């Protein structure tokens, strides 16, 4: 347990930031799942719209240090490739 007031404040801030980061991380995962769901349904237009929203949220996560840039780029690239391959598979 923290004894100094500054350590107590730091502990409070850590809890607060952790909750905010978890919320943002969960939101990113939700938007990725929406894209994957649209891909599985075969709706290319909806998948593209969902991807643009997800891409925005992912890059916001990078800006806020929720995920790393390379991880974000990899996720966006893989989702884009899946959408582009929808025409080829039919």
UniProtKB/Swiss-Prot annotation:
GO terms for molecular function: small ribosomal subunit rRNA binding; structural constituent of ribosome. One of its GO terms (biological process) is translation. GO terms for cellular component: small ribosomal subunit. Keywords: Ribonucleoprotein, Ribosomal protein, RNA-binding, rRNA-binding. The keyword Ribonucleoprotein applies. Binds directly to 16S ribosomal RNA. Belongs to the bacterial ribosomal protein bS20 family. This is Small ribosomal subunit protein bS20. It comes from Rickettsia canadensis (strain McKiel). The lineage of its organism: Bacteria, Pseudomonadati, Pseudomonadota, Alphaproteobacteria, Rickettsiales. The gene is rpsT.
């Amino acid at each position: 347990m923290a004894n100094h007031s500054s350590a107590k404040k730091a502990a409070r801030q850590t809890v607060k930031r952790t909750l905010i980061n978890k919320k943002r991380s969960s939101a990113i995962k939700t938007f990725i799942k929406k894209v994957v769901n649209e891909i599985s349904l075969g709706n290319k237009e909806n998948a593209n719209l969902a991807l643009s929203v997800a891409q925005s949220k992912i890059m916001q996560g990078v800006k806020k240090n929720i995920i790393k840039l390379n991880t974000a780029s990899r996720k966006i690239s893989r989702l884009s490739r899946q959408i582009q391959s929808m025409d080829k598979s039919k």
